[in-house]
């Protein structure tokens, strides 16, 4: 499946999670891999046309290969799911990572994706190069006041009675909290996204189970570059949540954005600040990839083990033995999509392009054996 915006194409794929749930994910852009951990409301195709999200997708795709996915029960992922526990959601992220063929990558955790990304980074420190948290938190109940808990209960009641109604009055409450500074067009889009992304029953179940997700105990374990961004006037997730992250993760840097919007919009002053911080934060990964590609291009027959990941080498060895992509996938227990992605990554690192890329990569492998 494909969709397009501003001349950019996204490739929509599916990964099977540990419990069999199919998780939809999309890939677009070029550069080092950046995994966007799913937030509360998403729909890969609907978001692609969004007046609220479009600037994020376009700009991040200029500097990274962006991988994003719909949470279980939401968007293009399997619906009617009842298990929305932290453990299940971490398994979903693991499934996407494996199916996409990612070895080492940066993570951008947005909103409710925070606990999942933090847990994943703690479990797999060898795979996450850096972690950015935007409008997020470690645990939903961190420093929650009695008033906030009462408000949360009221929101759950609103979902039950108004989410699936054809008119948006009830959903508009959530829209105002997300983008109080949005235009009417942007607010209508968020109104529609709520019904498009998830039904009322799943929204309630997922919301209740999400409250139990808490990765606070993992924060002292993290040892990687961490950037924390949050709007000062955010009414969905309080700024104090990000302060908690920054004060409990060693070396984390906190950037306070001058905005009241949970999702910083393209026309407000906070947007170029947010974008600059993210691009600068990702720059070391871009530099590392550029060095790897330059080294491969400069060397006639480079030591492939220093350029390619172990999995990319495995795939290339089987290709050299005459296996097609189906056979490679069967041998390594990978989807054909994942095999293709490993090969494309190898070609890029070796500076090979076009129809002769496979033959060129195989020739370089055989030259060192």
Where are these regions (language model features)?
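Conserved HGGG/HGGXW glycine-rich cap/lid loop of the alpha/beta-hydrolase fold
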Residues: 14-78
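Conserved acidic catalytic loop of the alpha/beta-hydrolase fold
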Residues: 87-105
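Conserved hydrolase catalytic core segment
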Residues: 103-146
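Helix-rich cap/lid subdomain of alpha/beta-hydrolase
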Residues: 134-192, 200-207
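Short beta-strand/loop motif that positions the catalytic acidic residue
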Residues: 222, 228-230, 234
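Catalytic active-site module of serine/aspartate enzymes centered on a nucleophile-bearing elbow/loop
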Residues: 252-298
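Regulatory hinge/linker segments at domain boundaries
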Residues: 288-317
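Basic, Lys/Arg-enriched C-terminal extension of HTH/homeodomain DNA-binding domains
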Residues: 348-369
């Amino acid at each position: 499946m494909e969709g397009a915006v501003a001349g950019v194409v996204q490739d929509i794929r599916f990964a099977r999670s540990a419990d069999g749930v199919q998780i939809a994910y999309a890939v677009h852009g070029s550069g080092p891999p950046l995994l966007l951990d799913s937030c509360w409301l998403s729909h890969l195709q609907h978001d692609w046309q969004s007046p609220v999200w479009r600037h994020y997708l376009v700009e991040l795709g200029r500097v990274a290969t962006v991988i994003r996915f719909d949470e279980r029960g939401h968007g293009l992922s399997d619906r009617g799911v009842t298990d929305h526990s932290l453990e299940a959601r971490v398994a979903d992220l693991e499934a996407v990572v494996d199916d996409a063929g990612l070895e080492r990558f940066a993570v951008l955790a947005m909103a409710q994706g925070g606990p999942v990304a933090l847990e994943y980074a703690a479990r797999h420190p060898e795979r996450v190069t850096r972690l950015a948290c935007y409008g997020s938190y470690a645990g939903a109940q961190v420093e929650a006041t009695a008033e906030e808990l009462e408000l949360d209960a009221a929101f759950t009641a609103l979902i039950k009675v108004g989410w699936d109604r054809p008119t948006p009055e009830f959903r508009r409450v959530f829209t105002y909290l997300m983008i109080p500074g949005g235009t009417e067009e942007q607010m209508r889009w968020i109104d529609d996204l709520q019904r498009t992304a998830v039904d009322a029953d799943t929204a309630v179940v997922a919301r209740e189970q999400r409250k139990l997700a808490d990765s606070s105990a993992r924060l002292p374990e993290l040892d990687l570059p961490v950037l924390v961004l949050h709007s000062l006037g955010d009414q969905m997730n309080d700024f104090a949540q990000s302060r908690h992250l920054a004060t409990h993760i060693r070396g984390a840097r906190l950037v306070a954005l001058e905005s009241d919007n949970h999702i910083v919009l393209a026309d407000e002053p906070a947007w170029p600040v947010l974008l600059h911080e993210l691009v600068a934060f990702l720059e070391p990964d871009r530099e590392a990839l550029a060095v790897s590609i330059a080294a491969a291009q400069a060397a006639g027959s480079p030591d492939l083990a220093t350029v390619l990941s172990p999995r990319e080498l495995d795939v290339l060895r089987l290709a050299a033995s005459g296996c097609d992509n189906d056979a490679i996938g069967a041998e390594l227990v990978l989807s054909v999509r994942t095999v293709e992605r490993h090969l494309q990554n190898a070609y890029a690192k070796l500076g090979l392009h076009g129809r002769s890329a496979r033959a060129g990569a195989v020739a370089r492998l055989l030259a060192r054996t």
